[in-house]
């Protein structure tokens, strides 16, 4: 898998999969078996969706052939499974517009300015796009780009923090880990939370305590009420309210926010697709929506007898991939098996069975 730079010029795509959770990842696999290359878009900065974000360490017992695995473990297995098909990733981006074109293709644009012109679209958005909870304080939205980052991954956070005075805002394990990740690169690291208690595993909490005692990380208790900027929009300081209700000023160069994420249906409701109670209605033979070339799989769809299970989403993704392959071919295709089909084995990059 490889990231793709965003571009205002539409990139041609055989298929775009919206949502990089387990069902979206398996959709990429099934499309790959059909010879359909996929672009994969997700609002989160990493693949895995709800599994990786909300229950990475919780056991899952109902995946066929896997007696038990964690959410993160399942995501890692799926990443290995789709590796032969090298989907193009557009992470940290949300599809904000989708429109059918006169030639039957679908034009999609993302919040990062990426434009994709696709022959088919597979919506695997689960309960909606997981987007970071925003800081609600005066002046925050006007900050210059790059001075406030929501839920950046470790590499991005460390790179942005180099030589800077950094405030990490949040109280969960992601915030604690970000403070630990930045401590060697940053000029100063402060961990800001509304109280001096953090929800994290024992190991990172022990590291945090050791670095606090060494004076390398400072914990600040308070809530952001506003920001102070230079005339050019450069972030200079946070306005805080301490536990006693007194205003405080905290100078900084970079603000990293880890306030959790929440699912939002977002613009899907504006795409002209038939819906039933905020979910996409589908044909259960193909999992096509009301618009040709657009499919919906996983928790985002609804139909009689629907069960919101990962394994059901895998079944839906399989039928959707077969349906699109036949739509593009213009005729019914023979069923092939990975155990015996040299064509499928070649696509998977494995040696034919002897």
From Swiss-Prot:
Signal peptide: none annotated. Gene3D superfamilies: FAD/NAD(P)-binding domain. It comes from the Bacteria. Its cofactor is FAD. Disulfide bonds: none annotated. Homodimer. The keyword Flavoprotein applies. It is an enzyme of class 1 (oxidoreductase). FAD binds at residues 42, 50, 55, 95, 130, 299, 339. Its EC number is 1.18.1.2. GO terms for molecular function: ferredoxin-NADP+ reductase activity; flavin adenine dinucleotide binding; NADP binding. The keyword Oxidoreductase applies. Binds 1 FAD per subunit. InterPro entries: FAD/NAD-bd_sf, FAD/NAD-binding_dom, Fd--NADP_Rdtase_type_2, Ferredoxin-NADP_redctase_2. Belongs to the ferredoxin--NADP reductase type 2 family. Keywords: FAD, Flavoprotein, NADP, Oxidoreductase. It comes from Acidovorax sp. (strain JS42). This is Ferredoxin--NADP reductase. It catalyses: 2 reduced [2Fe-2S]-[ferredoxin] + NADP(+) + H(+) = 2 oxidized [2Fe-2S]-[ferredoxin] + NADPH.
């Amino acid at each position: 898998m490889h990231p793709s730079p965003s571009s205002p010029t539409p990139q041609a795509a055989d298929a775009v999969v919206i949502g990089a959770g387990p069902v979206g990842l398996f959709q990429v696999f099934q499309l790959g078996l059909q010879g359909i290359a996929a672009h994969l878009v997700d609002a989160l900065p990493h693949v895995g969706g709800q599994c990786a974000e909300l229950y990475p360490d919780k056991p899952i017992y109902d995946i066929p052939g896997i007696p038990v695995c964690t959410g993160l473990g399942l995501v890692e297995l799926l990443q290995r499974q789709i590796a032969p098909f090298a989907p193009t990733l557009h992470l940290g981006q949300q599809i904000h517009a989708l429109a059918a074109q006169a030639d039957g293709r679908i034009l999609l644009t993302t919040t990062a300015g990426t434009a994709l012109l696709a022959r088919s679209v597979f919506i695997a958005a689960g309960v909606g796009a997981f987007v970071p909870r925003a800081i609600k304080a005066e002046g925050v939205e006007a900050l210059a780009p790059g001075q406030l980052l929501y839920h950046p991954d470790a590499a991005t956070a460390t790179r942005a923090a180099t030589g800077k005075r950094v405030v990490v805002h949040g109280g969960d394990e992601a915030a604690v880990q970000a403070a630990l990740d930045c401590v060697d690169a940053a000029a100063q690291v402060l961990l800001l939370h509304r109280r001096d208690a953090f929800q994290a595993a024992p190991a990172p909490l022990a590291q945090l305590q050791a670095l606090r005692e060494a004076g390398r990380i400072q914990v600040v208790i308070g809530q952001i009420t506003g920001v102070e900027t230079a005339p050019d929009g450069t972030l200079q300081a946070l306005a805080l309210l301490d536990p006693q209700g007194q205003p405080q000023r905290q100078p900084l160069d970079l603000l990293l926010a880890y306030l959790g994420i929440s699912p939002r249906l977002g613009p899907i409701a504006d795409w002209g697709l038939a819906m039933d109670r905020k979910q996409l209605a589908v044909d259960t033979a193909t999992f096509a929506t009301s618009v040709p070339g657009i499919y919906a799989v996983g928790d985002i769809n609804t139909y009689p007898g629907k069960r919101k299970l990962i394994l059901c989403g895998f079944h839906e993704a399989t039928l959707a991939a077969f349906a699109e392959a036949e739509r593009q071919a213009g005729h019914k295709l023979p069923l092939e098996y990975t155990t015996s089909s040299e064509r499928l084995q070649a696509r998977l990059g494995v040696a034919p069975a002897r």
